[in-house]
């Protein structure tokens, strides 16, 4: 009976069985999480720039966050450092970069003068991004990964950022064509 205890290995949460050696602890891996942190910073930077009226820089920061978001998962897969922590951290960073940042950039740029309707519209975008990310997290193991269901939050953020960037850089006034209502 003592021999059975010695040969039996228990797998605890966060432990990964290797291909023939002892268990190794799967923890927080640095490299992919550095990309995620950089993406989170880009989203935060976009919010700060929007609050300072620098909408072109804010839009570029959202695009940079999208680029970094595409790299963090690939780096984790290439280095075989995927973890549940990394997936959750990525999702939280996505909420800032592709949920809160585009909503606040759009609000500061075009919706602020609409009073209550402006912040409600910005909040609806932010809540939609949160719901999309939560649904993605719950369905992660169920859905065919070759296809997207719905519009991914980085793509929605890119549409908003691209719209703001083009209109701001081309100095299109907000009162032309009812641009506030389009935003």
Where are these predicted regions, by residue range?
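C-terminal membrane-associated helical module and adjoining short loops/tails
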Residues: 1-21, 145-183
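Topogenic membrane-insertion module of multi-pass membrane proteins
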Residues: 1-70
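Interhelical loop and helix-boundary elements at the membrane-water interface
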Residues: 2-3, 15-40, 75-95, 134-155
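Membrane-water interface of alpha-helical transmembrane segments
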Residues: 19-22, 26-36, 56, 112-122, ...
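Multi-pass membrane catalytic core of lipid/isoprenoid biosynthesis enzymes
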Residues: 29-36, 78-133, 163
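Hydrophobic alpha-helical transmembrane segments of polytopic
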Residues: 35-38, 58-62, 121-124, 128, ...
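Membrane-embedded alpha-helical transmembrane segments of multi-pass integral membrane proteins
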Residues: 42-45, 72, 100, 128-131, ...
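Helix-coil boundary and interhelical linker segments in multi-pass alpha-helical membrane proteins
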Residues: 45-60, 96, 100-120, 163-181
